[in-house]
Amino acid sequence: MLLSQTAASRMRRRGRGAILNVSSVASGTAMGTYAAHKTWVEIFSCALAEELRGSGVQVMALKPGTTDTGFFSKITTKIEDVPTIARLTPEYVVEQALNDLARGKVISVPSVIYKVMDFLTWKAPRSLVCRFTGYLQRDRFRV
C-alpha cells in the first residue's frame, strides 16, 4: 500500500505512469488469509484507480490463476497436480496484463477459464463459494 501510494504521488506530479498490483483469482474464496489479502489488493487497486482517474496514472489489479512460478515450491500442491488447461506461463500473464493495461482496464484476469471462475466466484451465493472452495482446499495450500 505504501509503495503504491508513494509511486502514485510521484506519477501524479509527472502526469503519467502505471501501477500494477498482483491480486489473484483466489480473492473472494475460502482460502483463508491468502484470499483475504488478495481481495484487499483488488479493492485497494480499484479505489486507487478511482482516486487517480484523469491524472494520467493508471492502476490495475492483476488476478492471475495458476502460474508456473516458484510459488508452488512453497505449498503442498505441485504445479503438476494442476490440469494443463489451467496452467499459465509467466510470459502469457505478462502479455495479457500489459494488453489490459493498454486498454485501461482496472482488473485483469488472464485466460478465459479464469475469467469464468472469477465471474462465478463473485456472482454465486457467498455460502456456496465458501463451502465449495473450502472443500477443494481442505488439504491443499497449507504452508
Give, region by region, the residue ranges found by the protein language model.
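Residue(s) in the substrate-gating loop at a strand-loop-helix junction
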Residues: 24
